[in-house]
Amino acid sequence: MYEYLDRRYALALYEVAEENNKVDEYLRDLKEVVNIIKNSEDICKILKHPEINTSRKKEIFTELFKDKVDDKILSFLLVLIEKDRILYLEEKLKEMEKIYLEKNNMILANVKTVIPLLKEEREELIEKLGNKYNKKIILEEEIDKSIIGGVYVRVGDDVLDGTLSTRLKDIKKMMLKRE
């Protein structure tokens, strides 16, 4: 249920951003606000405190962000405070990023490897995934020593797991079944 609300809030803000030709700026501003909230215990305490009323919370946010973010972003934040949804801002940001990717015919591919991909490997992976999904691929790379070797790719709900750790687990299961 809340995912639907997150999507609606994100879509509304995205449309405002698009009308003002500020989609990238709004995404950047929202990321900054999310990071500030996540990394500040004081802000979290204020937002969660039942004895601090909504008006005071809105005043605090206005003081904090009035010169740091676009007025429309600030208005959006104040609406979220009013509706008691500000603590879920990160979900709205993620939905807005999804909308951005959809509208620009792009898709995010999460890639895990033990060592960084070489330029040629990265380009080949982007090309193959682009052909498979018929979209521009945004590669998000992560180094993960626990996979031992190989590559793990997640695109949306699709997973391509060519990791050595998974192969070893599969072999172990197969050997245990034979006993």
Swiss-Prot record:
Keywords: ATP synthesis, Cell membrane, CF(1), Hydrogen ion transport, Ion transport, Membrane, Transport. Pfam families: OSCP (PF00213). The keyword Transport applies. Coiled coil: none annotated. Gene3D superfamilies: N-terminal domain of the delta subunit of the F1F0-ATP synthase (1.10.520.20). It is a peripheral membrane protein. GO terms for molecular function: proton-transporting ATP synthase activity, rotational mechanism. It is found in: Cell membrane. GO terms for cellular component: plasma membrane; proton-transporting ATP synthase complex. InterPro entries: ATP_synth_OSCP/delta_N_sf, ATPase_OSCP/d_CS, ATPase_OSCP/dsu. F(1)F(0) ATP synthase produces ATP from ADP in the presence of a proton or sodium gradient. F-type ATPases consist of two structural domains, F(1) containing the extramembraneous catalytic core and F(0) containing the membrane proton channel, linked together by a central stalk and a peripheral stalk. During catalysis, ATP synthesis in the catalytic domain of F(1) is coupled via a rotary mechanism of the central stalk subunits to proton translocation. F-type ATPases have 2 components, F(1) - the catalytic core - and F(0) - the membrane proton channel. F(1) has five subunits: alpha(3), beta(3), gamma(1), delta(1), epsilon(1). F(0) has three main subunits: a(1), b(2) and c(10-14). The alpha and beta chains form an alternating ring which encloses part of the gamma chain. F(1) is attached to F(0) by a central stalk formed by the gamma and epsilon chains, while a peripheral stalk is formed by the delta and b chains. Belongs to the ATPase delta chain family. This is ATP synthase subunit delta.
